[in-house]
Amino acid sequence: MFNIASAPFAHNRKQTQTLMLLVILACLPGLLAQTWFFGWGSFIQILLALVTALGAEALVLRLRRRPIKPALMDGSAALTAVLIGLSLPPLLPWWMLVLGTAFAIIIAKHLYGGLGQNLFNPAMVAYVLLLVSFPVQMTSWLPPDTIRAYDIGFGDAASVIFTGFSLDGYSMAQLKQGVDGLTMATPLDTLKTGLNQGLTTGEVMSHAVFEGWGGIGWSWVNLGYLLGGLFLLQQKVINWRIPGAILGSLLLAATLGYLMTPDATATPMFHLFSGATMLGAFFIATDPVSASTTPRGRLVYGVLIGVLVYLIRRFGGYPDAFAFAVLLANLCVPLIDSLTRPKVYGARRK
C-alpha cells in the first residue's frame, strides 16, 4: 500500500533558518576582504544593522499581533541586516544606516505582508533610499589600506560612524585622502567621473586605485563573494541560473561595449570584479522571494539584471547600478513568471 499525501509533493529539506544561516556564512570571505582593505567599518555597520533589523522586526510583529520569537529566529531579518551592512560605505553615519534598515524591515518587507510576500528586495530598497536621499555620504568610501594616508583602527571606525571624526580628530573628508593627498573614490566612481570629464579609459585607469582586475581591494572583495557564491551553489542553497545569467550577460555586454568604444568603456574583467558585481549576483539577486521562480524565468531575470547593470554603469548617472537593476527586475518578475510558466500536462493551449 502507498500513502498518498496532499500537495505539494516536492520538499526542500533545509529549513528557512538553515538557508539564511548558510547565506550569512557564505558572506564571510567577502566581509573579511572588505575588513582587510577598508577597515572595521563594515563589521560595525553589520552589528548596528542587526540590532536595528531585529528591533524593527519585533516591533512590527507586536503591532501586527504575530508571534515574535519564531520570526526573529528564522534568520530573514538578520540576513537583510548583513546585506545592508555589506552594501553601505563602511563609515556611513550610524543614523543613516538605522534609517535604511528600519525602512527595509518595516516598509519594504512588512508593508507587503512579511516574509515571502515582499515584491522588492528589502536590502536594495534601503540602499536606493539612502543613495537618493544622501548621495554624498553614500559614495564616501575609504581608499584601500595600501594607498590610504591615515591608518584607521576599530576605535577610529566606530568614532567616525558615531561622531563624524576619528579618535585623532580627522574628518571623513580627510580620511578619504590617498597617500598622494588627493581625495579618493571607488574605481567605478573614479571611472565615471573621468569619462565625464572627457578623459579616455586608458588615462583614467592609470590612476593608482585601478591596480588589479577591478581596482585595489575590490578584486579581492569580489573574489571573496565569488567563493561564497560557489559555496551556496555547492550546498544547493541557490540556483545557478540567476548568477550565471547575470555574469554571462554582463560579460557579453561589457565585451561588446569595449570592442565598439575601447576609449570610453572599461574592460569586461573590470566590470566583473569591481563594485557589487559578485555580491549582487550571488547574494542579492538570488533572493527567493523577489526573484523569478521558473527555470526559464530565472535566466531571463538574470540577463535583464546583467544588461541593466552594464547600461546604467555606462550611460547612467550612478557609478554602480546593481541596486537599481535588481529593483527594476523585481518589478518585472510577475510578468516574467507568467510568460515562462511551465505548461501543465494535459492542459489546453489558449
Curated annotation (Swiss-Prot):
Principal location class: membrane
Keyword Nucleotide-binding on entry: no
Cofactor: FMN
Matches recorded under InterPro entries: NqrB/RnfD, RnfD_bac
Record-listed E.C. numbers: 7.-.-.-
Positions of transmembrane segments: 15-35, 36-56, 67-87, 88-108, 122-142, 213-233, 242-262, 264-284, 299-316
Membrane disposition: Multi-pass membrane protein
Keywords, alphabetical: Cell inner membrane, Cell membrane, Electron transport, Flavoprotein, FMN, Membrane, Phosphoprotein, Translocase, Transmembrane, Transmembrane helix, Transport
Pfam families registered for this protein in UniProt: NQR2_RnfD_RnfE
Job of this protein: Part of a membrane-bound complex that couples electron transfer with translocation of ions across the membrane.
This protein's name: Ion-translocating oxidoreductase complex subunit D
